[in-house]
Every structure is written in C-alpha cells, then in structure tokens.
Amino acid sequence: MTLGNSTEVTEFYLLGFGAQHEFWCILFIVFLLIYVTSIMGNSGIILLINTDSRFQTLTYFFLQHLAFVDICYTSAITPKMLQSFTEEKNLMLFQGCVIQFLVYATFATSDCYLLAMMAVDPYVAICKPLHYTVIMSRTVCIRLVAGSYIMGSINASVQTGFTCSLSFCKSNSINHFFCDVPPILALSCSNVDINIMLLVVFVGSNLIFTGLVVIFSYIYIMATILKMSSSAGRKKSFSTCASHLTAVTIFYGTLSYMYLQSHSNNSQENMKVAFIFYGTVIPMLNPLIYSLRNKEVKEALKVIGKKLF
C-alpha cells in the first residue's frame, strides 16, 4: 500500500470510540468481562461436547464448530478494541491490519454458513426423519463444515487482496475500532468501484444465500409441525428449533441493521455500536442461548457442578 506521494503506508491509526474516551475505564471493564465470558462459554461448549458421550451427535458437531468460529472472530477484533480504551494513540501496523481483517472475515463468513447448516439439520430431522441418517451422514456434515471454512477463506482472501492493491492519499486514520474494509476504502485515493462491487457481491450473496436457506428451512419446519396431531410432538419440535431460531434472529437482525444504515456520520457511529454487538455480544450470547434451552446441556452442567463443588 502506498500514499499518493508514493510513501509506503506502514501503520494505521484506529480512531475507535474517541467521543467516549472519558468513560474508557468503565467500557474497558464491561467489554473485558463480555470477552472473557464469551471465551469461557464457547470453550466450555467445545469441551463439554468432546468429553460427554451424550453429545456425540451431528447437531452438536455443528454447534462445536460454531463455538470455535465465535472464539476466533471475536478474538480477532476484541483485544485491539480493548487496547483502544487504554492507549491514546491506537496504532496498528499494516501487516497486522491485513491479518486482523483476514481472520475476522474468514470466520465471520463461516459463521453465516454454519448457522444455515444448523437450520438444515432440524429441517431434515423433522420433515424427513426416515432419511435423516442418509442425508445428514457424518461424511456429508464434515464436507459442509469444510465448505463453510472454504467459503470464508475465499471471501476474506479476495477482499483483502483487492484492498491491499489500493493507494492512499487522504489519511491513515481509520474511523473504526478494527480494520474493516468499508472505512479503509474511504481513505483510498484509488478507484474503489471494483472493491465496492466485490464487497456488495460477496457479502450480499453470502447473506442472501444463507438467509434463504434458514428462511425456507423454517417455513418447511413450521408447516410440518403444524400438521402434527400430537401436541407433545409439536411442543418437542418447537423446543428443538427455539435455540437456533433465537440465535439466527439476533445474528441476521444485527447484520440487517448494520448494512441498511445510510452513510452519514451518525450512521458510522451507529455502525460501530452494531459491530460491538455483532463482534463481542453475540459470541457471548450463543453459548447461553444453546445451553439454557437445552435440557441435556443443563443436566451435564449440573453433574459437572456437583463434581466441582
């Protein structure tokens, strides 16, 4: 990357939350607690699934990968955000900026596909129960998870590669708390039409495709549940889907808010707030959502609690 006078860009200055700098101590403690809770919760989910034989099913296979992805993408942005509360100048080397976005974009995209797969799993279980073991075999599920990581890697690599080819002549101050593509494009003096097009195409296609998979899966699930004659069967099916549906609603609701904002100064600040929720709060909520509404998880946690205390 070069500036307009051919001076090489070696670092970026992350503006973060300059307007709230007087509350840095409170914000630091709050987001540190959220981050620690997120890491412990998701690590606990992974550990529980891999050590308890009751969780050796395909549903939990997807869940442990979702927990892993949540750990990775929140760890890509939260530590640097915490640093912005304690340092007056939050500088980041160009190489670090590239790595940060590459990791974040890879796992954030993978998260979308994993949530979509976790909608397909109950669809097959409820709508096609006799064919579940054939359609959702372990080999198929491994390929689906691998595909989610591949899609994440492709999206991140393309976005990063085209962003690295830009020249900068305006400033090296990024109006964000981490290195995201839109605020970086705003600093470029190169033609960014291709970059914007790629951003819209990749982000749009990933969100639309995974969103449609989730929507149609739940349309068929709800239609099948409503046809059930047994009220107990309907209640059990609704309970099976409730946790995932809650997580999906929060996830896509936040993304919709982020990308439907107008490009004003106020919307940039609102975008930061939305990104905080998306990048730090949602990874913390997912373990709570899936454990609090899951009897097997709650029973396993009670057993562990009795052993420890």
Swiss-Prot record:
Cysteine-cysteine disulfides: 97-189
Keywords for the protein's UniProt record, in alphabetical order: Cell membrane, Disulfide bond, G-protein coupled receptor, Glycoprotein, Membrane, Olfaction, Receptor, Sensory transduction, Transducer, Transmembrane, Transmembrane helix
Gene3D superfamilies per record: Rhodopsin 7-helix transmembrane proteins
Pfam families recorded: 7tm_4
Annotated glycosylation sites: 5, 155, 265
Extracellular side: 1-25, 76-99, 155-196, 259-271
Keyword Transferase included in the entry's annotation: no
Membrane topology: Multi-pass membrane protein
Record-annotated membrane-spanning stretches: 26-46, 55-75, 100-120, 134-154, 197-217, 238-258, 272-292
GO biological process, one term: G protein-coupled receptor signaling pathway
GO CC annotations on file: plasma membrane
Homology family: Belongs to the G-protein coupled receptor 1 family.
Its biological purpose: Odorant receptor.
Name of the protein this chain belongs to: Olfactory receptor 5AK2
Record organism: Homo sapiens (Human)
